[in-house]
């Protein structure tokens, strides 16, 4: 159960980062790429709807597993994310469906999450939790908090190449700045209390954006290493995968949460379980 909670914490952190960090386009060292990025950035800012499919292979190791007699464990996380009204936080809706398979686990771990009408709903592993979330405030707070980050400091090693009719921009995200950035975003979003992220470290982040002839970002590829240290034990992860954007610019219908009354309020849930377990079991 403890290791599984760790996995869920990772998934929650990744999901939070994915949902809270909009795909931003950054300036490039070369004039060609800078011009291309300018176009992509304008398109991204105007995007109101998104239907994305993520597929990541994850290799997990570290002393926590070694103590259990396991050298490493392979996982695969597949996600579908649907969002609309992205430029209007008051109206915004999103839905995430994630399916995780791992060595030694016969059943996949399924998670679905929804945001609608100021509430965030999570349904996973037999638990249904809801919490109020003010996306307008989070968006503003995140914007303000991340103003101090200089894009030139955050990204480096730009390359530009062709792939069929598409163009690809590759770049590296600076480790220290990214760790700072994630802490800042999660803190601004009020999510740092949910998960203790002090022991989180992300490194060797390599990214590629695939841009179609119309200037749409149609795929993002990412490799990274991540470790979480908690109570003196470390779990390490190597991730490699991509996020594809289906029909960029087209309207997306986002499913609504079914039976919202069946979800328990996060505060009540944490109160009950913290007393029982002596620690936060969720995420």
Q: Where do the protein language model's features map onto the residues?
A:
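Sec-dependent N-terminal signal peptides of Gram-positive bacterial secreted proteins and lipoproteins
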Residues: 5-27
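Subset-of-secretome marker
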Residues: 27-283
């Amino acid at each position: 159960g403890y290791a599984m909670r760790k996995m869920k914490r990772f998934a929650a952190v990744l999901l939070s980062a994915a949902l809270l960090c909009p795909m931003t386009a950054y300036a490039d060292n070369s004039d060609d790429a800078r011009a291309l990025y300018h176009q992509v950035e304008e398109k991204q800012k105007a995007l109101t709807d998104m239907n994305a499919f993520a597929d990541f292979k994850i290799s997990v190791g570290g002393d926590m597993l070694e103590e259990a007699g396991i050298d490493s464990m392979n996982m695969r996380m597949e996600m579908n994310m649907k969002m609309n009204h992205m430029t209007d936080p008051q109206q915004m809706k999103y839905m995430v469906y994630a399916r995780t398979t791992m060595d030694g686990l016969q059943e996949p771990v399924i998670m679905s999450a929804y945001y609608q009408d100021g509430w965030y709903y999570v349904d996973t592993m037999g638990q249904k939790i809801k919490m109020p979330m003010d996306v307008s405030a989070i968006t503003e707070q995140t914007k303000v908090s991340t103003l101090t980050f200089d894009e030139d400091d955050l990204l480096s090693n730009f390359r530009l190449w062709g792939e069929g009719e598409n163009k690809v921009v590759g770049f590296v995200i600076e480790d220290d700045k990214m760790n700072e950035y994630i802490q800042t975003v999660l803190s601004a979003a009020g999510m740092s209390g949910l998960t203790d992220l002090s022991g989180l470290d992300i490194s060797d982040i390599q990214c590629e954006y695939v841009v179609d002839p119309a200037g749409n970002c149609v795929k993002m590829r990412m490799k990274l290493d991540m470790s979480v240290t908690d109570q003196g034990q470390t779990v390490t992860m190597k991730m490699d995968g991509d996020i594809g954007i289906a029909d960029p610019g087209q309207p997306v219908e986002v499913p609504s949460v079914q039976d919202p009354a069946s979800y328990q309020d996060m505060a009540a849930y944490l109160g009950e379980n913290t007393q029982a377990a002596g620690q936060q079991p969720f995420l």
